[in-house]
Amino acid sequence: MQRIIFCEYEQRDTEGLDFVPYPGELGQKIFACIGKVGWAAWLVHQTMLINENRLSPRNPSHRAFLEEELNKFLFERRVAKPEGYIEPDA
């Protein structure tokens, strides 16, 4: 059964996630307030951040940086691109 939520990222009613995608309170907030399209957009952005900044998800300071960027991206609509980043051709 599909769950419809108001997505804070897309600013419209959309299909909600099927599962809590992140641990803790933040994961519950994402589950309640972010749709599938918004979460997919974050995963693409997160991959770019990891690759361009050479981050390791095993490093606690890198994880903290990614969590901060996740909050900015999904809930504050602020997107930071690494210095010198060039968008790939579509």
Curated annotation (Swiss-Prot):
It holds the Pfam family Iron_traffic. GO terms for cellular component: cytosol. The keyword Iron applies. One of its GO terms (molecular function) is iron ion binding. GO terms for biological process: cellular response to oxidative stress. Keywords: Iron. InterPro entries: Fe_traffick_prot_YggX (IPR007457), Fe_traffick_prot_YggX_sf (IPR036766). Belongs to the Fe(2+)-trafficking protein family. Could be a mediator in iron transactions between iron acquisition and iron-requiring processes, such as synthesis and/or repair of Fe-S clusters in biosynthetic enzymes. This is Probable Fe(2+)-trafficking protein. It comes from Xylella fastidiosa (strain 9a5c).
